UniProtKB/Swiss-Prot annotation:
Entry's family note: Belongs to the SecA family.
Cofactor note: May bind 1 zinc ion per subunit.
EC nos: 7.4.2.8
Description of how the protein assembles with itself and partners: Monomer and homodimer. Part of the essential Sec protein translocation apparatus which comprises SecA, SecYEG and auxiliary proteins SecDF-YajC and YidC.
Protein's name according to its UniProt entry: Protein translocase subunit SecA
Binding site for Zn(2+): 892, 894, 903-904
Recorded name of the encoding gene: secA
Function: Part of the Sec protein translocase complex. Interacts with the SecYEG preprotein conducting channel. Has a central role in coupling the hydrolysis of ATP to the transfer of proteins into and across the cell membrane, serving both as a receptor for the preprotein-SecB complex and as an ATP-driven molecular motor driving the stepwise translocation of polypeptide chains across the membrane.
Amino acid sequence: MLSALFKKIFGSRNERLVKQYAQNVKAINALEPSMQALTDEQLRAKTEEFKQRYQQGESLEKILPEAFAVVREGGRRVLNMRHFDVQLIGGMVLHAGKIAEMRTGEGKTLVATLPAYLNALTGKGVHVVTVNDYLARRDAEWMSRLYNFLGLSVGINLSQMPHGEKQKAYAADITYGTNNEFGFDYLRDNMVFTAEERVQRGLNYALVDEVDSILIDEARTPLIISGQADDSVDLYLQMNSIAAKLVRQEKEDGEGDFWVDEKSHQVLLSEQGHEHAEALLAEAGLLAEGSSLYDAANISLVHHMYAALRAQSLYHRDQHYVVRDGEIVIVDEFTGRMMAGRRWSDGLHQAVEAKEGVTIQKENQTLASITFQNYFRMYGKLSGMTGTADTEAYEFNQIYGLETVVIPTHRPLQRKDYMDKVYRTAKEKYQAVIDDIKECQKRGQPVLVGTTSIENSELISKVLSEAKLEHQVLNAKQHEREAHIIAQAGRPGMITIATNMAGRGTDIVLGGNPEGEIAEIEADEQLSEADKAARIAALKADWQVKHDAVLAAGGLHIIGTERHESRRVDNQLRGRAGRQGDPGSSRFYLSLEDQLLRIFASDRVGAIMERLKMPEGEAIEHPWVTRAIENAQRKVEGRNFDIRKQLLEYDDVANDQRKVIYQQRNELLEAADVGETIAAMRVDVIHDLIATYIPPESLEEQWDVPGLEKALQADLGLEIPLQKMLEENPNLHEETLREHIVEAANAAYKAKEEQASAPVLRQFERAVMLQSLDNHWREHLAALDHLRQGIHLRSYAQKNPKQEYKREAFALFSSMLDTVKREVTQVTMLVKVQSEADVEAVEKHPELENVQYQHADFDEALGNAEESDEASDQSVKTFERAGAKVGRNDPCPCGSGKKYKQCHGKLS
């Protein structure tokens, strides 16, 4: 109550921020006449002036009013678009490293030009991040006219782009691209063999479009670069037929072999299921007689068994994937787009291929991975814009430290959002949807029908076809025609069916969008200028008639056929209507058979319907019901937030290690000479070897000198007569022995240096270190995955799984670095190097020639970690640094508590 009173007196924080930014808007508006008086050349010269002022120490905040005024004037001259005052506020919010929530149709693409221009003045690069290649190309081509006019260069970073073009795109002042491509380029840059091969030049400022889609929806799915592993295709087929013979339990503790937990997206074998599965595996010859499914040798069988069960019970055709040209193509559950070339990891994709009877492709091995959460937190400054961020403001603040500011609309919102209608069955619901569509058609009102899956969109399409109603379908199977369909969805009486609308990027203009037809007329060389002008005028007049007719009919009507598990996605669908103050309306039609209601709210809503004795075909429409559904959505959102937070807490451990490895790699690439590092490694390896055979502070009787002689010969190629030395000098101390062995090793390596030229040997050393580091890092990633998948079981032993994971991951990491040192020392000591051909043999990286780029399914990425206990949040430091690198005397980032130079800094 007190907070409400304070808010009434002082206004909310959002209102106070908007008022604060409005003061700057006045300053920008005051500069407008002077900017209009400048010639094009004088306006362009302002960019160079701003750059010099920044170099001389003036802050971007001081330059902001003038810079924004320049961009506004440039937009007016080049694009015939003048930034509104609220768009200037949006630009300031984005420059401040915050999230701007702007309604659909408020001109987010134009707003982005303001902070992009201002931050490009630093010369460090600006990354404008979009959700797909089409939008990246469209926005870059559209806005590059303005940037080029003002003297800035623009690059487009697309997938499958040649290496040289990518480097050129990143060298530009402003680079447009997709979140996936920026992330994959970062990973690829940390897999190269020379510094010149890298494409990115540091992570300065990222401006993320559809920020909720990228930083929240896709945060559960790590980016993974993988290569094919050697698994038998037959195993997937056998597992598929065995899984099909297992019986699903109707209740969690009922009869059957396995239980499907739809809430946590997991499958669990029962005791009976274990026995049945073992019998079937033994029958198929996959399990030795008398052995258990959980013997160490059979762990991979458990992994494949669960993958097959999940493929059959949790992944459904035309909802989670489609079958196209004999391949399984994943469908993005948030945008409804097909994600061609993406594959689920950990054998799940192969299990789905076996289930659908298509060609099974081999399982992948992870070469490098990172989550969007950890990638985007590496930028010096991060900001984003979206139409729907307020519902996720808490998560943006918690995970990314980003504040959300709701920007006022240019014109007041006129859309009417009606209460949900809830029916008993899906059949009744769809009949009500058809009736509503028919009513809209009679009025000439355009309708957009939103669905949560391809299956539902095709079901409604079928019913509309039977009712002889013309319509357009927009889903992942049709995205080639996507922009055209959306552009015309506002025509009178038009019916458009669409899967989730996030990231579509094209506004629905009431009366239809004539821009495409106008462009065709202008491009027609056979028409005279007079004919073109006449046709365009007629087209615009026709559009105005249609536009007025749609306004009179009530604007665009949105029909939702199911509530999504996130309120934000529902709001995105609603937000398609009522753009820029247009009229519009929206209503959701639901049934107790819908997935969200069935899992979370059917009992409560069903009880209300029972009490009211609702007849068939009648809907319940009440604020209580809408509130119950919103509470169900909040539950799912809360659970999904916990999953993402959980994933981040686990990935933070890998991220600290990734930071150390990538810093080592970059130092190796940039170092002119790694000879000192090799020598330090050699000393460490010799000390470890001596400690194995001559334990510290041990008696001479406990020394295994013959064993040490053999180890030095086998591992380092050193023939040192240690026994003879001890016989000749019985008082020889352990330290003297150590010094003698190190001197002998150094002498042997110096002799090797004299045989090969110094540049060739330095190149060889660098190649060996990079190759060894890459190979063992890859194996370490697989080990971390396996550790994470089973770590939740520690909770049964009253241990905190997260702390256990952190402890064991550190032990694995330390062991990996010891292995790298040992391997590098062995190779450099034992391999003969005579020419550059020997170096090239080491530098070959065959696994990079046949790689795939994918999002892992979030459950696979997380394993069963959501079952584990809560642990405290970890502060995250990341490799691509905005500040100074880790100093030699600083605490090691791995969390050991030692100084960096005494821990993982030893490697460098």
